[in-house]
Amino acid sequence: MPIFRYALGLLVLTLAGAAAAHAGPKAAIFPFELIDVSLEGEHAGQQADETARLQLATEELRTLAAREAGYEVLDLSGLAAEIESTGPFHKCGGCEIDIARKAGAEIAITGAVRKISSLILVVQILVRDVASGKVNKVHRVELRGNTDETWLRGVRRLVSSHAGGG
């Protein structure tokens, strides 16, 4: 019986080590931001449906980054107040790095949706190395249409491009 327990213990340790060895980088994924340069945005400001789409896109990015790109996506909810007060990240030149470091991340991913008009949008993600603060990759896709489905399609294309090394 002691040999069985020993063998079982070794198996558990081996499997745990193998799982840890295959875990991807720890990623701090920050909420998408809207950069609205459209005439509509100038007059009406950010719309409730676009605010909801930002959250939808962020959740989709987090899900796909773990599932498709193999990242260990970190929970940033404990840093929500700091994230809110620090942004917008698309203007700060890497200010998200300190927050990502606090979360224990190896990479920081920020995203932005630039709304040019009701029909033309550009979705972008920027991936930074937390240790150096340098930008590793920038991925962007153009969208035609301002709907939940087009935003989700854009995020999926970004992750597919990133996971494929493109």
Predicted regions located by residue number:
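A short alpha-helix capping/helix-coil boundary motif
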Residues: 9, 39-42, 75-78
